[in-house]
Structure formats: C-alpha cells, structure tokens
UniProtKB/Swiss-Prot annotation:
It catalyses: 2-(N(omega)-L-arginino)succinate = fumarate + L-arginine. It comes from Trichormus variabilis (strain ATCC 29413 / PCC 7937) (Anabaena variabilis). This is Argininosuccinate lyase. It is an enzyme of class 4 (lyase). One of its GO terms (cellular component) is cytosol. Its main location: cytoplasm. It comes from the Bacteria.
Length: 461
C-alpha cells in the first residue's frame, strides 16, 4: 500500500507497509459496497436538498456513484488493498469519474456514521432474506407433516423411549422453533432500522444537514437521538448474532436427530444419494454430511457472537478501531445461517425418506405405553400415584417374563390389579396411545391436524 490515504496529510512519513496491510479492511468490507453506494447517494441528495452543495453537484455525485455500482457489478471496479477500505475506494473512484466535485461527497459525514449506516443497510437486507428462507423451511416441514399426521414415531426424553407421538407433531415442534426465529428477526430488524447517518465522527456536524431526509430516503424507521450512541452502537449486530445463534441451535438439534435417525441403530430415515457422501476407505458407508456440517457450523456462529460481546465490553465512547472487527464475524454468520437453511431445506425436501414401516415397528417394541396403563387405572378410580406404582409392578412382571405389555395375558393383568379388563389391550395400542392425547397442543391426531392447518395460516397460506 504505497498511495497516501485521505487522512495522511497530518503525517510526515508513510504508514509502514505491514501496518497498512494490518489496518486495511477492504478485503472484507467490500461486502458493503452496494450499501455504501446507496447510503452515499442519499447523503449527496441531502447535501443538495439543504443547499450545502448545488443541485447540479448533487446530480453529478448520484450519477457517478451509480456508475461505480454498474462497474462493480460488471467486474470492472475491483479495488485493491491500497484503498484501505470500501469507503475510500468509492470516494477515490468517484473523484476520478466526476472530478473535484467527488471530493465534496464527504462533507458533513464521517466514516464513523458512514460505516454504521452501511452495516445497517446490509443487515436489514440480510434479515429479510433469512426470514424468507425460514418461511421456505417452515413450508417444507409442513408439507412433510401434512403427509404424516398418523405416522407414529417413538418420542424420547433423556434419549430413552418415552411415549409414541405423531411424526407430524414432532416436525411441528421445529416449525414453531422456526416461527420464533422469524419473529425474533423481525424484532431485531426494528433496532437495525435506525439511521446513524449525520451523527458525524461523534458529535454531529456544523452543517445544516437534514437527518430525517436521509432516513426517509433510505427507508429507516427513525434516527439515533444521540450522536455518540449512533456511531458507537453495535447492539443491533449483537442482537442479530443472538438471533442467528438460536436459528443455528434449532437447525443443529434437528441435524442431531437426523444423524441419529439415519444410523443403523435407529434406521428411522434413509438418506438419498443426492444429500449424502461416502467413505474413501469403507465402501458400504453413506455419511450424513449435511446435518453434520450444520451441527459443526453452529459452533462457528456461537463463536462470532462471543467475539462481538468481548469486542464491545470495554470500549469507551465513541468510535474505536476495535469496531472494524465487527464485520467479518457478522458477514460470516449471515452467510453461514443462509447456507445452513438452504442445505437443511433441500435435505428435508429431497434428501431423506422416513421409513414408516420401521417406525411402526419401533413403537411396538418397548414400554412407552406404560403411562397409558396408569391413565387407564386412574380413569377407573384408582388414585394416579397408586396407579403409577401398580404400573411399575406391571413393567417389572413383564420384564421378568420376557414380554412386552401387549403380550401379557388378561390373567396376568388381573393378578396385578382387578380393574384391568379386555379393553386394556386397545388402551395400550400405539395408535390409541397417540390418538388419546387430544389435549390442546398434544399429539392426538385430531389436534395435530388442526395444528398443521393453524401453522399454514400462521405463515399466510
């Protein structure tokens, strides 16, 4: 980096090349270029609107910035490391295009409020894209759920068989996690959508700017009321990273289940060739790389959140160079969440198949219907805690006899308690066990059908 920087006139010697490279951010903040151009166009329009520059100069600046946009999109404008950052790169190219008028663009503006504006414009756009992806993920979950309302799957607590549930009910749990993610992003958006433009370096400006005018042009909901806060606030980025981390938590939990379900020990799903890989040495293998990568990338997003919190915890007001470190983790988190949502949506839609016969067998090979025996007795007047103890004896008797509950004879049942009758067999059948849980939000088929319909309405379908 040999070219002098805009700020270098106060200095007598050039920046050491290694320090210049260390200081530069153009390698990653180029991600903001389209947003920087948009923000600069609004700033130029405001300068003309308030009479700080002439209308003709404002038009020149806006047109020059638009030319840079086209050059960038066509691959003709690719600033190098000598630009230091995207803001200087744009300003330098603008001056080449429109001449000295380009040097007026930065009037009444600092890179501090400029980068804050760019980052908010970027994140606002990315939040909207992620919300769209979440909706598609939810639609795919609902499509599968709709087809599997009466498909049974073992339900687990402590990763031990607990009670059978509807497969649709299980998938709807992830739908509602995604719904909270969607709503949470909307809440974050409100605090992203605040304009710092016009806050200057930290104290505002002596020029008669109109901050509300630029906020309106850029479709910000409101402006920062305090210039110090405006240039130093990164709460919005931390909030986004929190929301992104929760999205990844939910995707990772689903990934973990798919990994288990695809194993030979579970055999609940089959991974299709389009979404699985093989082993370089073991030819029989079909590896669940997609969910494993999602699970692994979750830690990456968590790390960026932790890094941002640590960056911010000791910063005095207002702007500090530490804040340059807010971008790489933010950009990577955005890209990671988007990639994981896309991959998991494809996996669910095209890459796995539930083995319904295996699932049907699985729910008949355990004692997950034991709670229903206690409910059976309680419905016949036996106090639940007493019924609970009786069922413990039933399970103990069954294990000793090498039987499941369904295999006990009526005599064996009645030896344990006289309240048992022939209808006990229907009461403990997996299908009846699921169907009977018809409380609101439960796994009963009627409730799940209603829940699928309600979920469709919730996402506007």
């Amino acid at each position: 980096m040999t070219e002098k920087q805009t700020w270098s006139q106060r200095f007598e010697s050039a920046l050491h090349p290694a320090i210049a490279l260390f200081n530069a951010s153009i390698s990653f903040d180029i991600e903001l270029i389209e947003y920087d151009l948009t923000g600069s166009q609004a700033h130029a329009q405001m300068l003309a609107h308030t009479g700080i520059i002439s209308p003709a100069e404002g038009e020149q600046l806006v047109a020059g910035l638009e030319q840079i946009r086209e050059e960038y999109r066509q691959g003709k404008f690719q600033p190098g490391i000598d630009a230091e950052d995207v803001h200087f790169a744009v300003e330098r190219r603008l001056t080449e295009i429109v001449g000295d008028v380009g040097k007026k663009l930065h009037t009444a503006r600092s890179r501090n409020d400029q980068v804050g504006t760019d980052t908010r414009l970027y994140l606002r756009d990315q939040i909207s894209q992620i919300k769209t992806q979440l909706r598609e993920f939810q639609r795919v979950l609902l499509d599968i759920a709709e087809q599997n309302v009466e498909t049974l799957i073992p339900g687990y607590t402590h990763l031990q068989r607990a009670q059978p549930v509807s497969l649709a009910h299980h998938l709807l749990a992830y739908f509602h996690m995604a719904q909270r993610d969607w709503e949470r992003l909307g809440d974050v958006y409100r605090r992203v959508n605040i304009s710092p433009l016009g806050c200057g370096a930290l104290a505002g400006t002596t020029f008669p700017i109109d901050r509300h005018y630029t906020a309106k042009l850029l479709q910000f909901e409101r402006i920062y009321e305090n210039s110090l806060d405006g240039v130093s606030d990164r709460d919005f980025a931390i909030e986004f990273l929190c929301a992104a981390s929760l999205i990844m938590v939910h995707l990772s939990r689903l990934s973990e289940e798919i990994i288990l379900w695809a194993s030979e020990e579970f055999r609940f799903v089959t991974l299709k060739d389009s979404c699985a890989t093989g082993s370089s040495i073991m030819p029989q293998k079909k590896n669940p790389d997609v969910p494993e990568l999602v699970r692994g990338k979750t830690g990456r997003v968590f790390g960026h959140l932790q890094a941002m919190l640590v960056i911010m915890k000791g910063l005095p007001l207002a702007y500090n160079k530490d804040l340059q470190e807010d971008k790489e983790g933010l950009f990577d988190s955005v890209n990671t969440v988007k990639a994981c949502l896309e991959a998991m949506t494809i996996l669910l839609q095209e890459g796995l198949e539930f083995r319904t016969q295996r699932l049907a067998e699985a729910v008949t090979q355990d004692f997950s219907n034991a709670t229903d025996v206690a409910d059976y007795l309680a419905a016949r007047g036996v106090p639940f805690r007493e019924a609970y103890n009786i069922v413990g004896k039933v399970v103990k008797t069954s294990i000793a006899a090498g039987k499941l509950l369904k295999d006990l004879t009526l005599e064996e049942w009645q030896e344990i308690h006289p309240a048992f009758a022939t209808d006990i067999y229907e009461a403990i059948s997996p299908r009846q066990v699921v169907a009977a849980r018809n409380s609101y939000g439960g796994t009963g088929f009627a409730q799940v059908s209603k829940a699928v319909s309600a979920a469709r309405e919730e996402i506007g379908e």
